[in-house]
UniProtKB/Swiss-Prot annotation:
Record Gene3D superfamilies: Ribulose bisphosphate carboxylase, small subunit (3.30.190.10)
Organism: Solanum lycopersicum (Tomato)
Misc remark: The basic functional RuBisCO is composed of a large chain homodimer in a 'head-to-tail' conformation. In form I RuBisCO this homodimer is arranged in a barrel-like tetramer with the small subunits forming a tetrameric 'cap' on each end of the 'barrel'.
Chief localization: plastid
Record HAMAP family: RuBisCO_S_bact (MF_00859)
Stored InterPro entries: RuBisCO_ssu (IPR024681), RuBisCO_ssu_dom (IPR000894), RuBisCO_ssu_N (IPR024680), RuBisCO_ssu_sf (IPR036385)
Assembly: Heterohexadecamer of 8 large and 8 small subunits. (Microbial infection) Binds to tobamovirus movement protein; this interaction seems required for viral systemic movement.
Pfam families named among the record's database cross-references: RbcS (PF12338), RuBisCO_small (PF00101)
Boundaries of the annotated transit peptide in chain numbering: 1-56
UniProt subcellular location: Plastid, Chloroplast; Cell junction, Plasmodesma
Effect of residue 87 to V: In strain: cv. VF36
Protein name: Ribulose bisphosphate carboxylase small subunit, chloroplastic 2
Length: 180
């Protein structure tokens, strides 16, 4: 008998803790008839919705002669110091640097079909082989300079390839031809 009293007390304590943390059930929407209704007859559009003036308007990216190429391509061209910093980040993460270039279109375009495919500007020509084992950012920058010298009218980008997961992790434009 004593054991049954103890177990029932333990059960009662446990249920009280559960009940204390429970949320009351939803009882439904209240009728609007109980609240006084006042209508404002101002037909001014500015009085309908307001956010307190906290929004500052941003301009839309101009699409004419301002093509976007890669992530953050709307920023000014990277200097050599900034390129070295990006390449060091790529190497610090253990990614393999690889250079690619495109001589005609440095942006996504569709020439043969309306749906995306192989020839829509996403696949660039690889510059030499991926730089497996590279640990020096200046080596990569020297390859960028060599690619610029060989193809001055081409776009050059640097990608960081993760050879364990076999995915491209970073990609950025290192050089754009004059006028872009």
């Amino acid at each position: 008998m004593a054991s049954s009293v103890i177990s029932s007390a333990a059960v009662a304590t446990r249920s009280n803790v559960t009940q204390a943390s429970m949320v009351a059930p939803f009882t439904g929407l209240k009728s609007s008839a109980t609240f006084p209704v006042t209508k404002k007859q101002n037909l001014d559009i500015t009085s309908i919705a307001s956010n307190g003036g906290r929004v500052s308007c941003m301009q839309v990216w101009p699409p004419i002669n301002m093509k976007k190429y890669e992530t953050l391509s709307y920023l000014p061209d990277l200097s050599d110091e900034q390129l070295l910093s990006e390449i060091e980040y790529l190497l610090k993460n253990g990614w393999v640097p690889c250079l690619e270039f495109e001589t005609e279109h440095g942006f996504v375009y569709r020439e043969n079909n309306k749906s995306p495919g192989y020839y829509d500007g996403r696949y660039w020509t690889m510059w030499k082989l991926p730089m497996f084992g590279c640990t020096d950012a200046t080596q990569v920058l020297a390859e960028v300079q060599e690619a610029k010298k060989a193809y001055p009218q081409a776009w050059v980008r640097i990608i960081g390839f993760d050879n364990v997961r076999q995915v491209q992790c970073i990609s950025f434009i290192a050089y754009k031809p004059e006028g872009y």
